[in-house]
Amino acid sequence: MSKLRVGIINYGVGNLGSVQNAFAFIQTHFSDVLPHTLEIKVESHPERLQDYDKLLLPGVGAFGNAMTHLKNTHLDEAIREFVQSGKFLIGICLGMQLLFEQSEEFGNHKGLGLIEGKVVGFEHIAPLKVPHIGWNSCNFTPEGKHSKLFRGIADGSFFYFVHSFHIQTQPQFILAQCTYGYPFGAIVHKDNLFAIQAHPEKSHNVGLRLLANFLTL
């Protein structure tokens, strides 16, 4: 069995421990799904990103601070080069939002610009509270119904969310929607990019299955 090198990008604001634990669990419990053995590393050196077969961009916190960290460490350009090479990358939570063109969180900030669209705050609709915290169902769009990312995952499965902002993008990029007051794009796909607003590493078996599916793409 060949080895798949997976890099977890460390730029100072990521939820690295829980993501590492999730991949360790996947390697042990989803071996029947994976066509490769896994070599998982946390990576903070931009010049080494191209050494990996797949990358995961995690993140918690504020969009502007995260982009500042990426720029100061030159990881922003390294991520763009990795994606341009055709290799697969998945962003989770804040990591998802960073893939887009801009965010309105605490001002206007430019993102990585890899997916067309922007990040906006939730509308305050009583009695719903912001941030959106907890379990919520994700419903497949027509674009997502046959996605390999969802193999073994039922339509309407529940994922764990913690966020105050969400993405707005073109419908053809949205694989699944979640509703919190109104529908928003929860899981997206463009070319070799995937992203999920929820925390798959905290979403029990369904989230781990999604990450395992990503590794098989």
Curated annotation (Swiss-Prot):
Catalytic positions are 93, 199, 201
- Residue ranges crossing the lipid bilayer per the database entry: none
Q: Can you state which reaction this protein catalyses?
A: 5-[(5-phospho-1-deoxy-D-ribulos-1-ylimino)methylamino]-1-(5-phospho-beta-D-ribosyl)imidazole-4-carboxamide + L-glutamine = D-erythro-1-(imidazol-4-yl)glycerol 3-phosphate + 5-amino-1-(5-phospho-beta-D-ribosyl)imidazole-4-carboxamide + L-glutamate + H(+); L-glutamine + H2O = L-glutamate + NH4(+)
Q: Which InterPro entries match?
A: Class_I_gatase-like (IPR029062), GATASE (IPR017926), Imidazole-glycPsynth_HisH (IPR010139)
Q: Which keywords does this Swiss-Prot/TrEMBL entry list? A: Amino-acid biosynthesis, Cytoplasm, Glutamine amidotransferase, Histidine biosynthesis, Hydrolase, Lyase
Give an example GO molecular function.
glutaminase activity
- Give its E.C. classification number: 4.3.2.10, 3.5.1.2
Pathways involved: Amino-acid biosynthesis; L-histidine biosynthesis; L-histidine from 5-phospho-alpha-D-ribose 1-diphosphate: step 5/9
Q: Which GO terms describe its biological process?
A: L-histidine biosynthetic process
Say yes or no: keyword Amino-acid biosynthesis present: yes
Chief location of this protein within or outside the cell: cytoplasm
Localization annotation = Cytoplasm
Q: Which domain of life is it from?
A: Bacteria
**Annotated Glutamine amidotransferase type-1 domain residues:** 5-217
Q: Name one GO cellular component term.
A: cytoplasm
What is the role of this chain? Answer: IGPS catalyzes the conversion of PRFAR and glutamine to IGP, AICAR and glutamate. The HisH subunit catalyzes the hydrolysis of glutamine to glutamate and ammonia as part of the synthesis of IGP and AICAR. The resulting ammonia molecule is channeled to the active site of HisF.
Indicate the quaternary assembly: Heterodimer of HisH and HisF.
> What's the protein here called?
Imidazole glycerol phosphate synthase subunit HisH
